[in-house]
Regions:
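Long, compositionally biased intrinsically disordered regions
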Residues: 650-658, 662-667, 678-686, 690, ...
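Membrane-interface helix caps and helix-loop-helix hairpins in membrane proteins
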Residues: 617-626, 795-802
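Core alpha-helical transmembrane segments of integral membrane proteins
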Residues: 347-473, 518-563, 575-596, 600
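Membrane-interfacial, low-structure loops and terminal tails that flank and connect transmembrane helices
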Residues: 389-403, 464-529, 735-777, 781
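Soluble extramembrane regions of membrane proteins in the secretory/endomembrane system
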Residues: 36-51, 55-361
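Transmembrane catalytic cores of multi-pass membrane glycosyltransferases
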Residues: 314-320, 327-328, 337-375, 537-577, ...
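Hydrophobic membrane-spanning alpha-helices of multi-pass integral membrane proteins
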Residues: 406-416, 445-451, 537, 604-614, ...
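Hydrophobic membrane-insertion alpha-helices, especially the h-region
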Residues: 17-29
Length: 827
């Protein structure tokens, strides 16, 4: 009964430590923002800088006091397929003395850029459920405040396949007191059919001037309904803008936005009124999007709550976007930052570069991801072939070669993150479009950075070994050969042999034994083993630290999230989590083995490393990754139990499930209680509370299986992957059986007594694989934990089987390198 009580105490200890760490993180998450916002702030109406108030003309004050009950009207001038690079290109042609046919367009582009410099220019992410956003999709999304499709995936963007709604959530949220007027037939997808609601009694106006004559609070104009080229769109937008500036009511707030990107997916032009504010302030002269956490970037779904907030003074939680705060009136030339010509040009150039960066990331992410996974698979195949019963004279050379290649490939995930600090996306770019060479440059640069990471880790390992050398010389520890000889002299079945202490048995751990005999410290690790461990640890360290500071390197990364896909803009993405978790499992198991094993070590290492990773990944103000937290808690519990040599019964699995729900629920509560708009974790908690989460879960489930149902090529690829995985598992089971029977062609990799290399193929009866050190259990435990991680990650994340590929890419090289380096150091 005593060992069973120890098991129960250990399990309770693991649970208490994890819960304590999560509670501490929650307290910090709540108290931190509260302390940061404790300083008194001016009311929203007084938040404008004093320089703005001093520069307001007297007419603005008169206009604002003219009618306190009626907000200043808002005019939305919409176009499509227009980027900052397009405007800069047309304006540069005008400056270069282009032909007279394009001179008018160049002047129009100049005027639009000047208008943007006086306002708040931004990039607009217009992603909808499809890979490209048709104009009809954009209008329907604007009306619903959620991503929506008006055009079937296989249809063209010529016209909507969805019926025009009678009313829309946008019009309903505005209420009956806010009148709406539109120009262009496509706008009905955003506002509903004429007469469908009390505030839409009039039909679609035939022209901008007639719409302005109606003096509605909200006027939405489709300026690109008759345009098909950049020049035509720019000219039409400029004409509509001039008309609004001349004929609209004083103080009218003007929004310019390109809503669709069906020609070249990527961030679009958006200009908000000067003085527009965000809860996240500004950065580099650009408004930080509240939903994106990125400077100068907002989403199409943010426009809907922004309009409702500006005109109706309310915020509807049914909308997915986050509202920006428009100024009370339109004040031309008064922005939240310096609007000099040089500053305005710098802001526009930065936005154009950010859009180019996003497009280059989208073009690179599939190639870089496939390369990373392919290299991991190739490494495993090469290692299996090269290390299979080689000649005795080549064994050590092959071992070292495979080990260092694995160490190098283990550095690639970190390198692909760090390479984003250099402007690789600008190589060969032209007219706002990335070059095909940019992807190659990113990969080559990452290869060089990976070499630097390995070199740095090797230098640190050499320094550590040099510092430890005098101490080890003063009190030498037993050599690995002596340890192996001592293990070999124990009779088979002795209680001191590892075979008698199998994983199913529960015996006191090395650091808990009551034997009076002195325990031996683990032999010093060689430089290769320490280098491999450091390179593997760099993966979770780099990606999690980057996520904690806002993901400046992961956003628009060759491997990460970008503004084109627009699935996530901050925190820990699915790709980042797969890389982090895969490497983290290997690192925790490797560190535990270095510390000599034992239950206390398992608890300590998992609680510190795993708990820290869980806090960063799940905290709403850091990683905000609900799927990652759901995956990490059971995986860490399984890993701890495996390292501590404990058996998880179904009751303990139920307890782990309850703890997982508790941890994720705690993160959601923190998200809802902290100041500002909640992240998607908090919104999902609200949806669970009001019963609308079924739709979200359905969409995620479809995202998991949909590609394999609708695309035959994806189904064929999945079938091939299943066959390959099944073959690999069959081969692995055969090798494990041969290893246990002493007939494995890889038996020479095992540490042996007196440093002798056994013969393979069953010709040597006393195989060393029967008497390996208990520390060898860490490899088996890590493999099983990676299996749990992969299974749960695939099921709870909408990236699906892609998660398995990135887990393999991060874990396989690291695990192989540590295993081979460890066996070399033990010889």
């Amino acid at each position: 009964m005593r060992p069973r009580r120890r098991q129960q105490r250990l399990v309770r200890g693991v649970v208490y430590v994890l819960v304590l760490l999560v509670v501490i993180g929650m307290i910090l998450a709540v108290v931190g923002p509260a302390l940061a916002t404790a300083a008194p702030t001016a009311p929203e109406s007084e938040a404008a800088p004093a320089s703005q108030q001093a520069s307001q003309p007297a007419s603005d004050a008169a206009s604002s006091s003219r009618s306190s009950s009626r907000p200043a009207p808002v005019v939305v001038l919409a176009t499509n397929n227009l980027t900052w690079a397009d405007l800069q290109e047309q304006a540069s042609r005008e400056g270069a003395g282009a032909s007279s046919g394009s001179s008018g367009v160049g002047s129009a582009a100049d005027r639009l850029l000047a208008f943007a410099q006086r306002g708040e220019p931004m990039n607009l992410s217009v992603r909808t459920p499809a890979d490209r956003t048709c104009p009809a999709d954009a209008w329907l999304t604007l009306g619903r405040g959620k991503r929506a499709s008006a055009v079937e995936a296989a249809a063209s963007c010529a016209g909507p396949t969805a019926a025009i709604p009678r009313s829309t959530p946008l019009v309903g949220a505005l209420g009956q007191d806010v009148s709406v007027q539109t120009v262009g037939p496509s706008t009905q997808l955003a506002t509903g059919a004429p007469g469908g609601s009390a505030n839409r009694p009039a039909p679609v106006a035939p022209s901008v001037d007639q719409a302005l004559a109606a003096d509605a609070e909200l006027t939405i104009v489709d300026t690109a309904s008759a345009a098909s080229t950049d020049a035509e769109r720019i000219a039409a937008l400029d004409e509509a803008l001039r008309m609004v500036q001349e004929q609209s009511r004083p103080g009218t707030r003007i929004i310019v936005a390109s809503l669709a990107d069906d020609e070249a997916p990527g961030p679009q032009v958006a200009v908000l009124p000067a003085g527009t504010r965000s809860a996240r302030g500004t950065s580099g002269g650009l408004v930080v999007g509240d939903s994106t956490h990125q400077a100068g970037l907002t989403q199409l779904t943010d426009l809907t709550p922004t309009l409702v907030s500006a005109l109706a003074g309310r915020r509807d939680p049914a909308f997915d976007g986050h509202a920006l705060t428009l100024p009370e009136t339109g004040r031309a030339g008064v922005a939240t930052t310096d609007t000099s010509a040089a500053t305005g040009d710098a802001r526009i150039s930065r936005l154009a570069d950010d859009a180019l960066h996003a497009r280059a990331s989208q073009a690179t992410v599939m190639r870089a991801g496939a390369l990373l996974m392919g290299l991991a698979v190739a490494l495993l195949v090469w290692a299996a072939v090269a290390l299979r019963a080689p000649k005795a004279s080549r064994r050590e050379a092959l071992r070292r070669r495979v080990t260092w290649v694995a160490v190098y490939l283990s550095g690639l995930p970190t390198a692909l993150l760090l390479v984003n600090a250099a402007p690789w996306w600008r190589v060969g770019a032209r007219d706002g479009s990335p070059s095909g060479w940019a992807s190659l440059v990113a990969v080559v640069a990452a290869a060089l950075v990976a070499a630097g990471i390995v070199g740095l880790a090797a230098g640190i390992a050499a320094l550590v070994r040099r510092l430890r050398r005098p101490r080890s010389a003063a009190s030498p520890s037993p050599s690995p050969s002596a340890l192996g000889a001592a293990a070999a002299t124990e009779p088979v079945g002795s209680p001191n042999t590892p075979s008698a202490r199998g994983e199913a048995a529960v015996e006191p751990a090395p650091d808990e034994t009551a034997s009076p005999a002195p325990t031996l410290s683990p032999p010093p690790r060689n430089g290769t083993s320490l280098t491999a461990l450091l390179v593997a640890a760099a993966i979770p360290l780099a990606w999690l630290v980057d996520a904690a500071v806002g993901a400046p390197l992961a956003f628009n990364n060759p491997l990460g999230m970008n503004a084109v896909v627009a699935g996530r803009f901050y925190g820990v993405s699915n790709t980042a989590f797969a890389l982090v978790a895969g490497a983290l499992i290997v690192v925790i198991a490797g560190v535990w083995e270095v510390l000599g094993g034992g239950r206390r070590s398992a608890l300590l290492v998992t609680a510190l490393l795993g708990g820290a990773a869980l806090l960063v990944d799940g905290a709403p103000q850091l990683g905000a990754d609900v799927g990652g937290a759901l995956t990490l808690v059971p995986t860490l519990a399984f890993l701890t139990a495996g390292l501590a040599n404990l058996r998880l019964s179904w009751r303990r699995w139920l307890a782990i499930g309850a703890i997982t729900v508790l941890v994720v629920g705690g993160f959601a509560v923190v998200d809802l209680l902290r100041p500002g708009e909640p992240t998607h974790l908090g919104r999902f908690a609200r949806q669970v509370a009001d019963g609308s989460a079924a739709g979200v879960l359905g969409r995620k489930a479809y995202a998991l299986i949909g590609p394999f149902v609708t695309k035959p090529i994806m189904a064929a690829a999945l079938a091939c992957a299943v066959v390959i995985v099944a073959a690999a598992l069959w081969w692995g089971r055969r090798q494990v059986r041969a290893w246990r029977n002493g007939t494995s062609p890889y038996a020479w990799l095992a540490p042996t007594a007196h440093g002798d290399n056994p013969r393979v193929g069953g010709q040597e009866s006393g195989s060393p694989t029967r008497g390996m050190s208990p520390s060898g259990r860490w490899v088996t435990t890590a493999l099983k934990s990676l299996g749990v991680l992969t299974l749960v990650a695939v099921l709870v994340n909408d990236s699906g089987v892609t998660m398995a590929g990135f887990i393999l890419a991060a874990a396989a090289p690291a695990l192989l390198a540590l295993t081979l380096a460890g066996s070399e150091s033990a010889r």
